[in-house]
A protein has these predicted regions:
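Substrate/ligand-engaging "lid" and interaction regions
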Residues: 1-357
Length: 357
C-alpha cells in the first residue's frame, strides 16, 4: 500500500529543527538519531527539511508525507542485524526556490532551536554574488544568514531566540568554516554590529565529525523490502549499524540535545581534533595498509581481506601494535573503536571493493 500519514500513524511534535539537506546520509544518520531521541527521551521535536539547491527530493518526500524507512544492516557485537524502522520525524519539506516565503517564516517560529546541514563539501562556501534580497541566496551560508537576520529582526534581538547550528559536511572543523562564511555575509550585506553581536552571543556554530556508512537506496533488495514492509516506500535508505557523531560544544548544549540519554554514540567534546585523528589513523589507516597487500594477493573485497589468514592478522597487528600507539586518547576507547572498525570491515552486507579505497 502507499506510504503516507493515512496509512501509517505519525505523531505531531513541535518543529524545533531546520535541516538543510534531504539526502540519504542525513535521513539515515541525523533523522534516525532524532527518531531515537524522540522515542527514548523527552526531546519531542520534529524536523523541517529545506532543500539546499533547486533540484532535489522534496517532492518525493512530501508524496510520502515525509515518512520513510531506515534499513540497518551489519554486525553488532558479532550478531547479524538486518532491521527496518519507520522514521517519522520530518514534519514537512520545503523547496526555498519555489517556497521562499514559507522558508523565511521558519525564522519566525519561536520554538525553533537547531539547524543541521549536509550540503556536501562544496556547500560551505562564500559566493560574493549573493544578495540579501535574493529569494533565496544561492549558497547555503547565504540562505542561513538570511534566515538568522530575519529571526534577529522578528524577535528584536532577543538573546533567547538564538539557534544552535550543527554542520555535518565532511570538512575538518566545518563549524569554524561555516561561522567564518556567515561573518563574510554580515560584512558584504552590511547587516550591522547589533546583528553581529546577537549572532556571536545568542547563536552557536559547532564543528562536528560524522561517521556512518550509508549505501543509500537498496536497488537490488527493494522488491523484497517492500514485500516485507507491505508499504510502497520509494525512499528506503540502507545504512550500517555503527554511528558516531562527535560535536565540539559545551555540556550545556548536550543537555539540550540529550542523545546520550537515548544510548546513542553522540559525544560532546572540548575538541574534535583527536577524534578526527583517530578516524584517519584507525579507519583510513588500515584501509591503506590492507589495500595494496590484498590487491596483490588477488583478494578484491575488504571483508575477505580481513578474514584472510595472513592479511587479516597483519591488519590486526598494524592497528593494535603500531597505529594505536601514535594516538593520544584513552586506550580502552581506542580498542573499542578499533574493534568497531574491524566489525565494520567485516560487514556481510557491504561489498567494499579494495580498488575503491
Amino acid at each position: 500500500k502507499v506510504l503516507n500519514k493515512e496509512t501509517a500513524p505519525k505523531a505531531h511534535r513541535p518543529e524545533r529543527i531546520i535541516q538543510f539537506g534531504e539526502g540519504n546520509f542525513l535521513r539515515a544518520f541525523v533523522d534516525w538519531i532524532i527518531y531515537n531521541m524522540n522515542q527514548k527521551t523527552d526531546f519531542d521535536s520534529s524536523v523541517v527539511v529545506v532543500q539546499p539547491i533547486d533540484k532535489g527530493m522534496v517532492d518525493m518526500l512530501n508524496t510520502q508525507d515525509d515518512l520513510y524507512h531506515v534499513n540497518l544492516q551489519g554486525l553488532d557485537k558479532g550478531e547479524m542485524v538486518n532491521s527496518l524502522t519507520m522514521i517519522d520525524v520530518i514534519s514537512r519539506a520545503l523547496n526555498p526556490y519555489t517556497q521562499n516565503d514559507e522558508f523565511m517564516k521558519l525564522a519566525e517560529q519561536p520554538e525553533m532551536r537547531f539547524v543541521i546541514s549536509n550540503t556536501t563539501e562544496a556547500g560551505i562556501a562564500f559566493d560574493p554574488t549573493c544578495k540579501l534580497e535574493d529569494a533565496p541566496a544561492s549558497s547555503y551560508p547565504g540562505k542561513l544568514t538570511q534566515l538568522l537576520y530575519h529571526r534577529f529582526k522578528t524577535f528584536n534581538g532577543d538573546k533567547t531566540k538564538g539557534l544552535i547550528i550543527f554542520p555535518c559536511e565532511l570538512i575538518f572543523l566545518n563549524g569554524h568554516k561555516l561561522k567564518e562564511t556567515i561573518y563574510q555575509y554580515i560584512e558584504l550585506w552590511n547587516l550591522g554590529e547589533e546583528f553581529k553581536t546577537w549572532f556571536e552571543e545568542a547563536c552557536g556554530v559547532y564543528a562536528t565529525l560524522v561517521d556512518r556508512i550509508v549505501p543509500g537506496f537498496p536497488r537490488k533488495d527493494i522488491a523484497a523490502i517492500k514485500e516485507k514492509l507491505q508499504y510502497d516506500d520509494n525512499l528506503v535508505v540502507q545504512a550500517e549499524i555503527f554511528h558516531l557523531w562527535v560535536i565540539e560544544a559545551p555540556q550545556e548544549i548536550a543537555k539540550e540535545f540529550p542523545a546520550d540519554k537515548a544510548g546513542l554514540n553522540v559525544l560532546f567534546v572540548p575538541s574534535e581534533a583527536p577524534y578526527h585523528e583517530r578516524k584517519v589513523t584507525l579507519l583510513n589507516g588500515p584501509h591503506t595498509v590492507l589495500s595494496p597487500v590484498a590487491y596483490l594477493s588477488g583478494v578484491n573485497i575488504v571483508r575477505d581481506a580481513c578474514q584472510h589468514e595472513v592479511i587479516g592478522k597483519y591488519v590486526h597487528k598494524v592497528m593494535f601494535d603500531e597505529l594505536m600507539e601514535t594516538l593520544n586518547l584513552p586506550k580502552d576507547e581506542l580498542e573499542k573503536f578499533a574493534n568497531d572498525v574491524l566489525e565494520r570491515f567485516n560487514n556481510p552486507f557491504v561489498d567494499h571493493a579494495v580498488t575503491s579505497i
